[in-house]
């Protein structure tokens, strides 16, 4: 191959999918005699890494590149008259989790094709507490949610999703007691919130009807 798998993740996934049987018979892949088509995704563009405040060295890939990789594999399998099992060892914590993203819609469509089976990895986040599910009772005005951020963290992107037709607003209370009142829904565009003592800046954006799901998105 003209390139190498520097991370080793793709090689590991290929072994799980199609690895040959070991000498002692303790391991072999799901389909050890299959033919393998490999797509190596290029890293996400710098401006996207900056926008999402990704840590240096963190692996990140663009959804459109993944979709183009799937298209290539579909054409490759069709040109050889072979069925396709498309294994994606990639994941994200973003999105509505309802299959309404462009990639989600593509995978749902492919799942209905004869001779095409999308296989996705899941569960790697385990108990890392990167998701929170809550609700506000009728007799309550708000619910407190605590975010624990490491000292070395330069920043992160957080998404809050409401279940249609619910709408929410957010406010903030810093560890030193600085309080930001709830930001009204009437505000359009980005809202910049600054905590002077923590030297922290928060950007809030309301999307009251996200294009794919129709639900409210706050990020």
Please place each PLM-identified region on the residue numbering.
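Substrate-binding/specificity loop regions of serine endopeptidase catalytic domains
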Residues: 91-219
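Subtilisin-like serine protease catalytic core
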Residues: 1-62, 81-82, 113-115, 154, ...
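Short acidic, glycine-rich surface-loop motifs adjacent to enzyme active sites
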Residues: 68-98, 121-122
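Structured segments of extracytoplasmic/periplasmic soluble domains
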Residues: 16-20, 69-72, 76, 110-113
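Hydrophobic side chains in beta-strands
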Residues: 18, 38-41, 88, 160, ...
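Structural detector of well-ordered beta-strand residues that form the stable sheet scaffold
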Residues: 37, 87, 117-119
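Active-site-proximal cofactor/substrate-binding loop regions of enzyme domains
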Residues: 62-68
């Amino acid at each position: 191959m003209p390139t190498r798998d520097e991370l080793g993740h793709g090689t590991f996934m290929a072994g799980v999918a199609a690895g040959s049987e070991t000498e002692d018979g303790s391991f072999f892949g799901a389909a050890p005699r299959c033919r393998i088509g490999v797509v190596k995704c290029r890293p996400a563009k710098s401006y996207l890494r900056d926008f999402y405040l990704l840590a240096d060295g963190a692996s990140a890939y663009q959804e459109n590149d993944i979709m183009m990789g799937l298209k290539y594999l579909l054409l490759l399998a069709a040109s050889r008259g072979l069925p396709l099992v498309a294994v994606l060892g990639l994941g994200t914590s973003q999105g509505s989790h309802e299959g309404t993203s462009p990639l989600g819609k593509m995978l749902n469509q492919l799942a209905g094709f004869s001779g095409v089976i999308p296989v996705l990895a899941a569960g790697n986040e385990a108990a890392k507490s990167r998701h929170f599910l809550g609700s506000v009772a009728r007799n309550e005005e708000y619910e407190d949610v605590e975010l624990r951020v490491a000292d070395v963290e330069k920043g992160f992107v957080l998404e809050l999703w409401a279940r249609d037709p619910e709408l929410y607003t957010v406010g903030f209370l810093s560890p030193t007691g600085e309080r930001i009142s709830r930001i009204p829904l009437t505000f359009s565009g980005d809202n910049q919130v600054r905590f002077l003592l923590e030297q922290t800046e928060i950007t809030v954006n309301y999307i009251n009807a996200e294009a794919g799901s129709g639900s409210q998105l706050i990020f």
